[in-house]
Amino acid sequence: MIKRVLFLTVGILSLMLAVCETKAINNGKKENKMKTIELTKADFLKKIVDYEKNPEEWIYLGDKPAIIDFYASWCGPCKMVAPVLEELAAEYDGQIYVYKVNTEQEQELAALFNIRSIPSFLFIPMNDKPQMAMGAMPKSSFKEAIDGVLLKK
């Protein structure tokens, strides 16, 4: 009887150690997949364009092409597009940035781009003028725009 209890205790402890070690290994892995990046006005001025310094000229400050999603937390179509943008951020990791601007919190940015309908998307190529698109789009349309406008494949 004592042997059974001892074996059972040792077995349970071994199992617990194995599970804990597996969790530690998984937690140690770096997740390289890029996520969408939330922008505030201050971030926008540093990463996208400093419209206060250069109000008449578009000078993109980024080092990669970008998409900016102008959204609101209550917007149904915005919620439908959000996972698609997360997938695209991971899929095009290292090639483009995918930013998000909450139009409720960043009303100045929304007004600057004359956002009247959400979701709205600003596609920013490296050496060209940005292009705006309005309304929810399927993933295939985003990929077309990324490949054609941003990456010029």
Q: What are the functions of these language-model segments?
A:
Residues 35-37, 97-99, 130-133:
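Structural signal for short hydrophobic segments within the conserved structured cores
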Residues 70, 81-89, 93-107, 115:
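Thiol-based oxidoreductase modules, predominantly thioredoxin-like and allied folds used
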Residues 73-80, 120:
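C-type cytochrome heme c attachment motif
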Residues 63-66, 70-74, 117:
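Short pre-active-site segment immediately N-terminal to redox-active cysteine/selenocysteine motifs
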Residues 1-45, 153:
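N-terminal targeting signals for export/organelle localization
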Residues 45-46, 106-108:
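Short loop/turn elements that flank and shape the SAM/SAH-binding pocket of Class I
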Residues 117, 122-153:
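Non-catalytic, surface beta->alpha helical segment in thiol-disulfide oxidoreductase systems
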Residues 40-65:
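A short beta-strand-turn-helix
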